[in-house]
Design a protein with these regions (language model features):
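Positively charged, polar, low-complexity stretches
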Residues: 1-131
């Protein structure tokens, strides 16, 4: 699989792709591969903690959606030229503590990040699945 066959700067369900294939494709393209398995997360805070740990966010990460956006965009942008990103959020919770509205708010942050990187002509692809 080659990343060129997947439209850049999007957020979509992982259905048609395997995590290992996405990781290999990111590696072959020289892009960052960011993976978070959120199978034990039950709440918004659990999800943010899981993403922060998996993506090795700095200790000062504010653990809210604004801070998530900052870590996915501005903080990375300031660290120098970026080759592109493949992000996988696997097993997002689907329960009353992390309901559809919470999932949409989280995915909107990643859509905004995709737009941010797209404006800079940097590919950003985010894939997700639910528990």
């Amino acid at each position: 699989m080659e990343l060129q066959t997947i439209r850049p700067n999007l957020v979509q369900a992982i259905r048609a792709y395997r995590v290992d294939d996405l990781m290999s494709a990111a590696d072959a393209a020289g892009q960052h591969f960011l993976y978070a398995n959120l199978s034990t997360a039950q709440s918004k805070q659990d999800v943010l903690d899981g993403i922060a740990a998996a993506f090795t966010f700095p200790a000062h990460f504010g653990k809210n959606l604004d801070a998530l956006f900052d870590c996915m965009t501005d903080l990375v942008h300031k660290s120098g030229p970026q080759p592109g990103f493949v992000v996988v959020l696997e097993q997002l919770p689907d329960n009353p503590r992390f309901d559809r509205e919470a999932r949409e708010q989280l995915l909107e942050v990643f859509r905004d990040a995709a737009e941010y990187w797209g404006e800079r002509r940097i590919p950003f692809r985010c894939f997700y699945s639910f528990q």
